[in-house]
Curated annotation (Swiss-Prot):
Protein name: Small ribosomal subunit protein uS14c
Keyword field: Chloroplast, Plastid, Ribonucleoprotein, Ribosomal protein, RNA-binding, rRNA-binding
SUPFAM superfamilies: Glucocorticoid receptor-like (DNA-binding domain)
Assigned protein family: Belongs to the universal ribosomal protein uS14 family.
Subcellular localization, as worded in the UniProt entry: Plastid, Chloroplast
NCBIfam families membership: PRK08881.1
GO BP, sorted A to Z: translation
KW RNA-binding (keyword) present: yes
Annotated function: Binds 16S rRNA, required for the assembly of 30S particles.
Protein backbone atom coordinates (compact mmCIF):
# COMPACT_ATOMS: atom_id res chain seq x y z
CA UNK A 1 0.00 0.00 0.00
CA UNK A 2 1.38 3.39 -0.99
CA UNK A 3 1.61 6.16 1.57
CA UNK A 4 -1.44 8.39 1.63
CA UNK A 5 0.73 11.48 1.28
CA UNK A 6 2.08 10.21 -2.06
CA UNK A 7 -1.40 9.48 -3.33
CA UNK A 8 -2.55 12.98 -2.32
CA UNK A 9 0.49 14.50 -4.02
CA UNK A 10 -0.43 12.66 -7.21
CA UNK A 11 -4.02 13.97 -7.01
CA UNK A 12 -2.67 17.49 -6.58
CA UNK A 13 -0.55 17.04 -9.71
CA UNK A 14 -3.60 15.86 -11.64
CA UNK A 15 -5.55 18.97 -10.62
CA UNK A 16 -2.65 21.23 -11.63
CA UNK A 17 -2.31 19.46 -14.97
CA UNK A 18 -6.00 20.00 -15.70
CA UNK A 19 -5.78 23.64 -14.64
CA UNK A 20 -2.84 24.52 -16.91
CA UNK A 21 -3.68 22.19 -19.79
CA UNK A 22 -5.20 24.88 -22.01
CA UNK A 23 -2.33 27.30 -21.40
CA UNK A 24 0.23 24.69 -22.43
CA UNK A 25 -1.74 23.62 -25.48
CA UNK A 26 -2.33 27.18 -26.73
CA UNK A 27 1.32 28.16 -26.33
CA UNK A 28 2.42 25.03 -28.21
CA UNK A 29 0.05 25.93 -31.04
CA UNK A 30 1.50 29.46 -31.10
CA UNK A 31 5.02 28.06 -31.38
CA UNK A 32 4.06 26.05 -34.46
CA UNK A 33 2.49 29.12 -36.11
CA UNK A 34 5.23 31.68 -35.39
CA UNK A 35 8.15 31.92 -37.84
CA UNK A 36 10.65 34.27 -36.18
CA UNK A 37 13.05 32.80 -33.66
CA UNK A 38 12.82 35.69 -31.18
CA UNK A 39 9.03 35.30 -30.95
CA UNK A 40 9.44 31.57 -30.41
CA UNK A 41 11.82 32.20 -27.50
CA UNK A 42 9.25 34.49 -25.87
CA UNK A 43 6.58 31.83 -26.18
CA UNK A 44 8.98 29.22 -24.77
CA UNK A 45 9.35 31.50 -21.75
CA UNK A 46 5.56 31.53 -21.32
CA UNK A 47 5.55 27.76 -21.61
CA UNK A 48 8.02 27.50 -18.73
CA UNK A 49 6.03 29.81 -16.45
CA UNK A 50 3.42 27.27 -15.16
CA UNK A 51 4.47 25.14 -12.18
CA UNK A 52 6.53 22.04 -12.83
CA UNK A 53 3.95 19.73 -11.33
CA UNK A 54 1.44 20.86 -13.95
CA UNK A 55 3.39 19.06 -16.69
CA UNK A 56 1.66 15.89 -17.90
CA UNK A 57 4.94 13.96 -17.88
CA UNK A 58 5.12 14.19 -14.09
CA UNK A 59 1.93 12.16 -13.62
CA UNK A 60 2.01 8.45 -12.78
CA UNK A 61 -0.68 5.86 -13.24
CA UNK A 62 -1.48 4.31 -9.89
CA UNK A 63 -3.26 1.12 -8.90
CA UNK A 64 -6.85 1.81 -7.83
CA UNK A 65 -6.76 -0.53 -4.87
CA UNK A 66 -3.20 -0.11 -3.52
CA UNK A 67 -1.91 3.13 -5.05
CA UNK A 68 1.22 1.37 -6.34
CA UNK A 69 2.89 3.47 -9.09
CA UNK A 70 4.72 0.63 -10.86
CA UNK A 71 3.68 -2.41 -12.89
CA UNK A 72 0.23 -1.05 -13.77
CA UNK A 73 -1.96 -2.53 -16.46
CA UNK A 74 -3.82 0.21 -18.31
CA UNK A 75 -6.75 -2.00 -19.26
CA UNK A 76 -7.59 -2.76 -15.65
CA UNK A 77 -6.04 0.12 -13.71
CA UNK A 78 -4.50 -2.38 -11.31
CA UNK A 79 -0.97 -3.31 -10.38
CA UNK A 80 0.38 -6.68 -11.45
CA UNK A 81 0.13 -8.50 -8.16
CA UNK A 82 -3.41 -7.26 -7.39
CA UNK A 83 -4.47 -8.22 -10.92
CA UNK A 84 -3.04 -11.71 -10.37
CA UNK A 85 -4.86 -12.09 -7.05
CA UNK A 86 -8.16 -11.00 -8.61
CA UNK A 87 -7.75 -13.41 -11.53
CA UNK A 88 -7.03 -16.27 -9.11
CA UNK A 89 -10.15 -15.35 -7.13
CA UNK A 90 -12.22 -15.30 -10.38
CA UNK A 91 -13.17 -11.65 -9.88
CA UNK A 92 -12.26 -10.60 -13.44
CA UNK A 93 -14.52 -12.21 -16.04
CA UNK A 94 -12.75 -13.46 -19.15
CA UNK A 95 -9.28 -13.41 -17.63
CA UNK A 96 -7.57 -16.79 -17.44
CA UNK A 97 -4.59 -17.93 -15.45
CA UNK A 98 -1.55 -19.00 -17.36
CA UNK A 99 -0.04 -22.37 -16.61
CA UNK A 100 2.83 -24.16 -18.25
Amino acid sequence: MAKKSLIQREKKRQKLEQKYHLIRRSSKEEISKVRSLSDKWEIYGKLQSPPRNSAPTRLHRRCFSTGRPRANYRDFGLSGHILREMVHACLLPGATRSSW
